[in-house]
Amino acid sequence: DISDKYIETINEKTWIRDDIKPYELFLKTLYEYFKEEINEDKNYDWDEILPDGFMNLQYQTDAVIQAKKILDAYNGVFISDVVGLGKTFICAMLAQKLKGRKLVICPPVLKDYWERTLQQFDVQAKVESLGKLDSILEDNDLMKNIKYVFIDEAHRFRNEKTESFQKLHEICYNKKVVLVTATPQNNFSSDIANQIYLFQPKNNSTIIPNNKNIERFFGKLDGRLKKLEKGTVEYTETLKDNSEIIRDKVLRNIMIRRTRKEIMEYYKDDLEKQGLKFPNLENPEKIIYSFDDNIEQVFNHTICKI
């Protein structure tokens, strides 16, 4: 039997009450779902953390909090904001919050930039170029003690059949991985899948509920494309459909990606604080080129080969 005291408690001390409107219940549901991120933001004094001269921008601090949550849940996260939104700064702020030894792997031309940025944010980390994977593997102390691996331009490792991918996979084994790229996928689903395999087991994944075999999931999507002729309408439509499935089933759980349009819509105050305006892109205009006979012949031959 249900006691009167139990009924009284339900009616007066919970959200299951007649005077609670559906919209209020909806807001309460949102709060309960996102309260970790909301409360986490209150725990950080970003102005104390940021180096002198760096602005406290909400779109960057939000990304740090979300990235840490994803990293803890799945052992890896994609930071894939479009170009120009400060992915390196977001990574440096994230690294501040992570306890444990860190390794940054980046293109040689960006090595000095990464080292300067991490120094500005008072982050201790080993920075190595993409061409030094062998040196990393040979450093037993480093390999034993690394807890986090940051990979800049991670899209370079889309092909698991390459030697560099195999070396990187060995480096990342049993580590938490941060993949930094604005272009994680090119054409095939395997582009994104191979990068995910750097931090998730193929046959024991935790990303898709009730579907541990993520290799089979991506294999089915790639199989749909391989049956079609590249360049056809059906191929293009299938490619779009595959991308939507991947976004809905996989990337929404492990990727942070904001476009300039989204920043303008949801973080307008940040843009005003920076005095930043994104350029308005005009519609493309057709430009006709004229070649002499020899160049035109070479051009046409090249197009046919492509």
Enumerate the predicted regions with their spans.
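Catalytic acidic motif of RecA-like/P-loop NTPases
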Residues: G84, H155-R158, T183-Q185
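Inter-lobe coupling linker of SF2 helicases/translocases
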Residues: L130-N145, E153-F157, K161-N174, L179, ...
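ATP-dependent helicase/translocase motor core
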Residues: D1-V82, F89-K97
